[in-house]
């Protein structure tokens, strides 16, 4: 996690401080999960301030600037609105409103004394910091910056490669076939995704965010076979390339993304939630050699 001394403006080029905040309405926004798009963080102060309403109207005058996969907008308030209904109505996958009622997020971006808009690149580094008192006009300057941004895939000027390790032949073919046959015979259940509420992590099924069926492997002998091949064939590669000694496995599952029902998993990080912060590496091993599904994408890269 990055930090920024309270009250100091963020330095352009530096990584932005990570944060999580409740959405006005329902749900939670985690900055670290939102990577992979240009992100507009507009610190608006109190919604009771008439200028906050005017600046917001000006910023959202051209909503076509914002797109869930390209540029997203977050309006951040330091006090609750008298009526949240208008903000809920304006909310879309590309436009959201965040509750920063203790002011901690605003302070970490230097927005406590002077409201401002900060633009982040897909790797969550600051590329623009436009205060309300900008001589060229706050909203107009923000719009000019957004119109000048390249496509997400061209944000670095050169192709980027995710720090993902690909290791062939981790499982024997016999183990792959066995696990596939067990799944075909028993089937899986909706796996859902982890969701934090009131400091607790629970599982929520929402087909817009994820659709996958999982079968937990519970037989000790099978788990030991899986673990043995991973420890001998994958763990040394992780230690060699990432200088990290993996000592535990979180769970043993056979997962299926079925194209017939639109299997998918929306953007996420595996260790954001309270109940998953022990995770360090996600391991996916393809079991079937006729797999021709979608790609695994790392939005930041």
Please tell me what each predicted stretch does.
Residues 37, 53-75, 88-89:
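Conserved helix-turn-beta segment immediately C-terminal to the redox Cys motif
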Residues 32-34, 111, 132:
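Residue-level structural signal for beta-strand termini and adjacent loop
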Residues 29-60:
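Short active-site neighborhood of thiol/selenol oxidoreductases, capturing the structured segment around
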Residues 74, 88-114:
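Short, internal strand/loop/helix patches
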Residues 80-86:
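Short, charged/polar "capping" segments at the starts of alpha-helices
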Residues 19, 106, 114-132:
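A short, hydrophobic beta-strand/beta-hairpin element that forms part of a small beta-sheet core
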Residues 122, 140-301:
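Fe(II)/2-oxoglutarate oxygenase catalytic core
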Residues 1-32, 54, 58:
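N-terminal "domain-start" segment that seeds a small globular fold
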């Amino acid at each position: 996690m990055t930090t920024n001394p309270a009250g100091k403006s963020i330095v352009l080029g530096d990584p932005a401080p990570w944060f999580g905040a409740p959405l006005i309405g329902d749900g939670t926004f985690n900055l670290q999960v939102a990577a992979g798009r240009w992100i507009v963080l507009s610190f608006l102060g109190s919604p009771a301030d008439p200028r906050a309403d005017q600046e917001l109207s000006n910023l959202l005058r051209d909503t076509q600037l914002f797109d869930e996969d390209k540029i997203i907008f977050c309006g951040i308030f330091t006090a609750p609105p008298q009526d949240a209904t208008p903000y809920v109505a304006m909310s879309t996958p590309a436009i959201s409103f965040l509750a920063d009622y203790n002011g901690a997020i605003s302070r970490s971006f230097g927005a406590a004394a002077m409201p401002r808009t900060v633009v982040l690149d897909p790797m969550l580094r600051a590329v623009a910091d436009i205060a309300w008192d900008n001589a060229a006009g706050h909203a107009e300057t923000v719009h000019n910056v957004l119109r000048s941004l390249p496509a997400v895939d061209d944000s670095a000027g050169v192709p980027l490669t995710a720090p993902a390790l690909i290791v062939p032949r981790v499982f024997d073919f016999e183990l792959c076939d066995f696990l596939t046959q067990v799944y075909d015979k028993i089937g899986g259940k909706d796996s859902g995704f982890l969701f934090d509420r009131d400091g607790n992590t629970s599982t929520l099924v929402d087909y817009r965010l994820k659709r996958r069926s999982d079968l937990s492997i519970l037989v000790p002998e099978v788990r030991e076979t899986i673990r043995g091949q991973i420890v001998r064939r994958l763990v040394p590669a992780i230690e060699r390339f990432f200088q990290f000694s993996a000592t535990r496995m979180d769970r043993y599952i056979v997962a299926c993304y079925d194209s017939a029902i639109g299997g998918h998993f929306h953007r996420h990080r595996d260790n954001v939630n309270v109940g998953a912060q022990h995770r360090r590496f996600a391991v996916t091993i393809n079991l079937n050699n006729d797999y021709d599904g979608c790609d695994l994408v790392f939005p930041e890269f």
